[in-house]
Amino acid sequence: MWDFSTEPEFQQKLDWMKQFVRDEVEPMDLVFNRPGHNFDVTDKRALAAVRPLQEEVRRQGLWACHLTPELGGQGYGQVQLALMNEILGATKWGPRVFGCQAPDSGNAEILAKFGTAEQKARYLAPLLEGEIVSCFSMTEPQGGSDPRVFETKAVRDGDEWVIDGYKWFSSQARWASFLILMAVTDAKAPVGERFSMFLIPGDTP
C-alpha cells in the first residue's frame, strides 16, 4: 500500500492550501465560471481577482512548485506535487492561482531546458510571472495523441521552416502568446526520433 504521509512542515503547507483554496479560490468559480460563462484566462475582472491571490501564494513559498528554485519554484517531488494537485483540482482557478496551470507548466520546463536566451527573455520570463499564457499543440484528429500516426510535417525552406498539418484540442490556443508545436521532421527515423518541437508566436498567420 502506498504511504502518502508527509513531513509535518509540508503538511502545514497543505493545510494552508486547503483553507486558502476553499475560502479564496473556489468562490471565483461561482463568479467567473457560472453557466453561460466560458473559462477565459484573459477576463480582466478575473485577472484583477487572481493577482492578489497569486501574490499571497508567492509569499507562502508555494508558487510554481514544480519548477526548480532557479526558476522561482520549490522543486518538489512527484508525491508532494500530487498531494498539492489533489487540492488544486477542486477548482478551475486553483492551478492558475498557484502558477502550475497546464500547459504553461510543461512549456516553461521545455523553454528552461532548451530555449535560447532570446526565447527565455521574450517568453519564459513573462510566463513564469503569470503575465502571459501558452499553448502545447500536439493532438491530431486522426490519431489523438498517438505520435505514430501524426501527419503534421515541418520542412526547412532556406532559413525558415514550413509547417503543414492540422492540430486540434490545443489548450489555450485562443489566448496564447506562443505555441509549442510537435511536428514530423524525419519520417524515416524511429518513432521516438522523428519529431521536433517548434516555438511559434501566437500571432503567426
Enumerate the predicted regions with their spans.
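Active-site-adjacent elements of ketosynthase-type condensing enzymes
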Residues: 141-151
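A structural signal for short hydrophobic beta-strand segments in well-ordered beta-sheet cores
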Residues: 154-155
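Short, solvent-exposed loop/turn elements at beta->coil junctions and helix N-caps
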Residues: 70, 139-143, 168-169
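Conserved protein kinase catalytic domain
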Residues: 85, 108-111, 124, 180, ...
